[in-house]
From Swiss-Prot:
It comes from Homo sapiens (Human). This is Protein MFI. It is found in: Cytoplasm, Cytosol; Mitochondrion outer membrane. Keywords: Cytoplasm, Membrane, Mitochondrion, Mitochondrion outer membrane. Can homodimerize. Interacts with MFF; the interaction inhibits MFF interaction with DNM1L. The gene is MFI. CDD domains: C11orf65.
Amino acid sequence: MPWKEESEFTKQDKAARVIQQAWKSFLNVAIFQHFKSLIDLRRQGEPRQIVKYINPKEAELLDAAAGIHVRFRLGGVKFPPDIYYKIFTHRPIEDLCANSPRNYAKLPAKHTSHNKNDHLQEEDHSGWYHRIENNGWRPVSDTFWLSTDGMVVEDKKESEFHFSKLKRRQDLEKKRKLRKIEWMRQMYYSGSLEAKSTHHETLGLIHTATKGLIRAFEDGGIDSVMEWEVDEVLNWTNTLNFDEYIASWKEIATSNSSANFKGFRFNQAQKNIYNYGGDISKMQMGIPDDTYYENVYQEPNVTRLTPDSTYGL
């Protein structure tokens, strides 16, 4: 009968949708694991060599004396995600714009600098002790091979760099607290924030404290919530430690420091040759020896993802 055929067709359609959703979920997980493996450095690799493959022009500006390391992350508004990178320095670097009382980009003209009139124009002090930080997260792409003439770079975000170290530290703590609150707020509204206790009264107290903390943040802003309050709620609610989670991701997607790499030394290489003594079989056979170099960067063994990839199926 027609209604039986329609019912069977509906069952087949539902079964096909279940199979399609399961396959799509598996494919998305496999794609994410692939992108995660691309940035799985774990404190390995020479930073300048890594940046050279990403942006050769920027790699020429890197100085090993600055103690540089490169960090990667996944991001973007679509899936598959984009890979972003940022260069960090962990040695003191003096910035002239942040420590000198002058805006060198707006120097007075020569004819006004020698003017001895009584009615001199007051010097504009705007921009003094001011620095703009342009070292943001940028996507890994092949656009550096193309000409940038006539191209508009979108989302070029500039972050301010305060000259006071205390102010920079306070801003960093405020940003870390905001990230924790947003993380807890997102888990709370998605229903993934679970309490560690099974006692009914304790669950009620935890739920009330979490709800009050989020409401105080939404009404009064970030200054109305203390960081220790957020830590207490996170300790009572979720088994996932936020700080350990962030530290783990930073460890995964961070290269080695340029301070750990030294240049090639001819004396050391010559000493290694003398240490062979009478055994020159390796040198005659042309077998490479890693003792000639103090550090050797090995390119990670990765595969390119294509639409035809089936991940072993």
